[in-house]
Regions:
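Conserved N-terminal phosphate-binding loop of PLP-dependent enzymes in the Aspartate aminotransferase
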Residues: 1-404
Length: 404
């Protein structure tokens, strides 16, 4: 939809949002009217260099032509059916995903938090059915993030702050341990623990990758204790970190993995994949979703996955991510640069505000996000080139120098 076709001004649109919408976001002060590849464009055609990709969603670029074509073709055939009949996009995507990431079964959702809810439910049901009614406890990481619905929010290790504030008691059955501390995770487990749930990179927590020793140690410990390893790949999945799934960087395999964001090419879809044994915890009536596995979203995801794999965008994420982070370490006031592929966090010293850097980059027509007091996060489309990273670096450098 174009602004010129509405008879309204840009300010009219902003006013309507403020009047009618429940706002929980700090918006960029522009109207994103069109997008293509590495850029968003406002109603005047002004380009904005996109280094947030809808928060790690548009991995194969905004409005990828093959994804757009797949959506248009599917809309011409059938849009929504619920999950009573078989649909072709569901079946083809299920096979593609399971074979690509080495898992046995898939269950479709609509978002990342829904995928994590399903993962929690499956793990608890598996534990109770196999070991008895008390085997439901799950250990997650402090400062992690798993979503904003109640189960996922309760799994989020931010007690007393962050997304848990103001909602009363959290769902019972979770404990938190420090990230990358294998001993602390082992100590947090009890005879009632059925699973450890972990992000391979803590995105909202400041972009902190897990160490190989930690991830491999969790896998070995879960195997030893008859527990499940649940890996949240909502943000890290689908080539973002230099591998198709981040857990592949560690040479391990989860019992259940969640995904969303980068799977759908801009369309809302989430999923969990599980081993054959664990997947049997779900049967008719165990879980469900009206829109999960939506034919249009599955068609988009099938095209997106094809693009990611055919163009080796995992390889590009690793190559360009290494190139870009080496440059970012030369920025003034940098305390640390952390990354895995093209999931990048830059932490500045106490004199530089991450929010101020975000705003300064926006003023220079570049889009990034800020997390914490002094950290910026960048998750560009995986099609990004070294030349576009050079441009981004110059914008960030100019911004930081202006704030010094």
């Amino acid at each position: 939809m174009k602004l010129k076709d509405t008879g309204l001004t840009a300010q009219d649109i902003k006013d309507k949002v403020k009047k009618y919408m429940i706002e929980t976001y700090e918006r960029f002060d522009f109207i994103a009217e069109t997008a293509e590849g590495m850029y968003l464009y406002d109603e005047n055609g002004t380009p904005y260099l996109d280094f947030y990709a809808g928060i790690a969603v548009n991995n194969a670029g905004s409005r990828n032509p093959k994804v757009v074509a797949a959506v248009k073709d599917q809309v011409d055939d059938i849009m929504h059916t619920f999950n009573y009949p078989y649909t072709i996009p569901q079946a083809l995507l299920a096979e593609k995903v399971c074979k690509t990431i080495g898992m046995d079964k898939i269950f479709y959702q609509n978002s990342g938090t829904e995928a994590n809810e399903a993962m929690i439910k499956m793990a608890r049901k598996y534990g109770i059915e196999k070991y008895g009614p008390n085997r439901y406890h799950i250990v997650t990481a402090k400062d992690g993030f798993h979503g904003r619905t109640f189960g996922a929010m309760s799994a989020t290790g931010q007690p007393g702050n962050g997304c848990q504030v103001g909602f009363g008691p959290m769902t019972y059955g979770f404990s938190y341990a420090p990230y990358n501390d294998l001993k602390a995770f082992k100590d947090a487990c009890t005879e009632n623990t059925i699973a450890i749930m972990i992000e391979p990179v803590q995105g909202e927590g400041g972009v902190h990758p897990a160490t190989p020793e930690f991830m491999k140690g969790l896998r070995e410990f879960c195997d030893e204790k008859g527990m499940l390893l649940l890996i949240d790949e909502v943000q890290t999945g689908w080539c973002r970190t230099g591998a198709v799934m981040s857990y592949m960087n560690y040479g391990i395999k989860p019992d259940i993995v969640s995904m969303a964001k980068g799977l759908g090419g801009g369309m809302p879809i989430g999923a969990i994949c599980a081993t054959e044994e664990v997947s049997k915890a779900f049967s008719a009536g165990s879980h469900g979703t009206t829109f999960g596995g939506h034919p249009v979203c599955c068609a988009a995801a099938l095209a997106e996955v094809g693009e990611l794999l055919d163009r080796d965008l995992a390889g590009n994420a690793k190559k360009v991510g290494d190139y870009f982070t080496a440059k970012l370490e030369k920025l003034p006031h940098v305390k640390e640069v952390r990354h895995q592929g093209l999931l990048i966090g830059v932490e500045f010293d106490d004199t530089i505000s991450g929010v101020d850097v975000k705003h300064g980059c926006f003023d220079r027509h570049m889009l990034i996000t800020a997390i914490g007091s002094h950290i910026i996060r960048m998750v560009p489309p995986l099609i990004v080139s070294e030349e576009e990273c050079d441009k981004a670096f110059d914008i960030i450098k100019e911004t930081v120098e202006s704030l010094s």
